[in-house]
Amino acid sequence: MRNLKNVLKKYPNVRLSIAHLGGFQVEDLYGLNAYFNFSAILPDYVNRFGIKRTNEILRLIGVDKLVFATDFPDSRCLKPKEIYDKYFEILNEMDFSLEEAENICRNNALKMIDKI
């Protein structure tokens, strides 16, 4: 993660999406000028930290920096519908507003690629 921080400091205008929320290096993510997708790892976060703490972690990273991604084909060999259903089941248990959910699932990605 240190290398990513150095790249972002050297090139502050680069648009970077960090996959899987950067793994479980949660503390290293706070304050980075990057986007974070939570493909595949969201259920793992919930299993490890629970819904409440996962929600807190996502909010500390910043709702405006979160991007939904499918990570298909998922290594868990689930069908796409099962993957999406699980993600949205988890997201529905969190306290995101409708606007925040729309940003995570669509608008943040559009902002991320806007200048490409």
Indicate residue ranges for each PLM-predicted region.
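Catalytic pocket-lining loop regions of alpha/beta-barrel enzymes
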Residues: 1-67
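Divalent metal-coordination and catalytic microenvironments
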Residues: 20, 36, 71, 101, ...
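Short glycine-enriched loops at secondary-structure junctions
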Residues: 23-24, 73-76
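Short, solvent-exposed polar/charged micro-motifs at secondary-structure junctions
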Residues: 27-28, 47-48, 77-78, 112-114
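Conserved short-loop catalytic and cofactor-binding motifs
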Residues: 38-42, 75, 89, 97
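Mid-to-C-terminal alpha-helical segments outside catalytic/metal-binding sites
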Residues: 62-65, 79-116
